[in-house]
Amino acid sequence: MTLTLKKRLKNAGILTAVFIVAVIIFSYVTNKGNDNMTADMGAATFPQISFSYGEYKINTLTGYAKRMDISSMHNTITPVANQSLDVNVEAYGNKFTGASYKVYTMDGTSQLEHKKIKKVGKGFTLDLSGKKVLDEERILEVRLNRNGADPVYFYTRIVSDEDAHVTECLNYISDYHENALGKVENAGVGAALEPTDDADNTTLQHVTINSNYEQVTWGSLKPQVEQGERWSIKELNSTCMSVQLQYRVSCKGEENEADRYAVKEFFRVRYIADAKKTYLLDYDRTMEQIFDATQKVLNEKGIILGIAPANLSYKVNKDGTIVSFVEANELWNYNKDSDEISLVFGFADAENTDVRNMVSDHKIKLLKVDAKGNTTFLVSGYMDRGEHEGEVGVAVYYYDIEKNSVEEKVFISTNKSYAQAESELGEMSYYDAKTDMLYTMVDGTLYQYSGEDAEKKALVKGLDAQQYVVSEDGRLIAYQANGDLETATKVTILNVETGKKQKVTCGKGECIRPLGFVRSDFVYGVAKTEDIGNTVSGEATVPMYKLEIRNQKGKVIKKYQTDGIYILSASFDEDMITLERASKDGDTYTATAPDYITNNEQKTKSNIALETYATDLKQTQVRLTYNDGIADKEPKVLKPKQILFERPQTITFSDKDAPEKYYVYGHGDIQGVYTKAGDAIKKANDYNGVVVDSSQNYVWERGNRNLQYSITDKDDVLNTIKDRLKNQEKPIDILKDVNNGEAYDLTGCTTEEILYIINQGRPVIAMLDSQNAVILVGYSDTNVVYEDLNDSTRHSVKYEEMDQMTSGSGNTYIG
């Protein structure tokens, strides 16, 4: 080797060493005080369990990292045969030192059983023969103790399979599912349907029992199931069974040879033992295309989303060049200028086919896309993998488009079920990246959390559910700033994005109520304090004589006022406001016909819009259309890294003072949370579902009642109700006294909807007008039975006639 070459190598080595030292110093300086690194989201590590029932593997359960609130765990129900239950364990590499299980009452207040399992292996059997363990529906908690890791917890409701005909129902569902997939003719698929003229037979995205045979049998898609179905029994009693199947299918494509879809398929069935036949009571199936950026997803018009919901969530930047959108529980970002498309967030993706990551017990909510395309979003519910694997809560994330990274800003942890986290915490939270502030409403307390100094403070406390409203995007919160519901004279509108506040006040002798938002326009009502009274049921009410809509500039853009008519409440559906109205009779307000207001606020125009179009194979499809088109149709696919902190910020909130709530479950998922039982029942009826209260007591179930029923041996109770009604006492107070402090306002329900309440042995007061009432005490398959207040003679009228009789009170029932 020549001297010159040696010298060059020596100099090169010195330069390399200097460069490495410089990089280390630069890295230290730029990261000083910020202990973080970037990495892919970690793989799932938790085991899973399922249960065997005959030849079926049912209710595959995901594990929780900590003990959960028993009374909130409603997701599945597992039938128990012969007082024992076979548990299957999918270890996924975990080693176990043992297991244990406990059985609780539904409200979680009483533990009925606790036993230990020494050897886990591939499964074990639970002995449930203990006293009172299976007397009625219970909650089962299974704990797996892992070697070298924290224990994992699993929850399901359990019930005896006696008279439930579980095998017959599961067989029917399995056959129907397979025959629909295979388009098998004369196999009972079409015969079980109930086609109607108003069913939408132009889309495969959502089909129901009212759809036609062609839609239910997947059109021309020729689906093939991938990795099997996940069977979950959602409701089970002696009259019917509800089951949800979740799976993925590969179908014939158009732009691509094949497309993949996430599917949820719901069945509600009944087995009639005498006829030895199973009947389909309800059917509901949704499918959503899994966006695969490695295939053709762009054309000259925009981004092809395929078969997807027509109201798919998306937000665009100011220039209309960048869009973030959510499809099949994955968040994507497309930048037209840089020709890049990024999978911002998703537990399951093309590279990760672990079935544990395909559990869709979470929801992604877009909060904001700024001018550069940076995206702020929430993930609420159960966390399949990553930093918070096995936890339930709300994670706040910030996607930095220039750094191609996703940073978790804060995690709100809860011990409630994923369904409650989604519907409550997730809907009431907002994060602003500029100020690094999180705002969340928890049971009437508005909290502000600073990410910079990790401090939490309550801005407003003690608000009733009717005292505040939150805009759909969570950016605007309006609340009564002084007094209570009946006396507040001021409402504060807080823009959590800017921190700015607006005040709205009313006149002397008046009170003001926030009602809601139509996009960014604030809707509120004004009442006169002298008008405050009661509804026919006896519930206190603040009747508003006028309603106003105010824009963000503080200008009133619409008023609603009708002589002699008062507004009791308002509900919102996009740009439509439905007003529940009443007329006055003394101090009592009797419901009258609702009215409707359409707000004409113009949507902000953008270069990007969500549109639908149709093709022969896939029928109705969805596209994010660029008005100026797309030139390059082969984008660069990016997968952002996650920024991981040594000490991620996690916060919790207390809900010890939470008011009574009613949870609606239907079609396999939670469908709403209400503070009034009647509203919950009406919603549940739309989904053939159930209503439970905060302690998991069943308030209402579709169809689970006797065909005929009569309340007997309660003459003393009925006489007490009659005497107190004659004394003009409030119906709601009377029934609270006779029902151990519990009474349901069922106003607005139909007679047929409240038969379940009567079947529980609870007399129902039916108000004929503001003063007169009858007591419902029984029913047949067509008629309802009632007693007048002045005697014990029982009268029978058709359901529809009773609805007509109570129309003078706005169909007021109290049970």
Please provide the spans of the model-predicted regions:
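Surface-exposed, charged secondary-structure patches
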Residues: A17-F19, V23, S27-D35, S71-D86, ...
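Short loop/turn segments that connect beta-strands within beta-propeller blades
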Residues: K336-D339, I401-K403, S450-A454, N495-G499, ...
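Beta-propeller fold detector
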Residues: E113-K116, D282-Y283, I341-A350, V406-T414, ...
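Exposed beta-sheet edge and beta->alpha loop/turn motif
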Residues: C240-K277, D284
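Core segments of small alpha/beta cavity-forming domains
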Residues: A44-T45, S50-K102, T109-S110, E137-L221, ...
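Conserved active-site-adjacent core of cysteine acyl-enzyme catalytic domains
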Residues: S710-G815
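Ser/Thr/Pro/Gly-rich low-complexity linker/stalk segments immediately outside membranes or between
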Residues: T30-I49
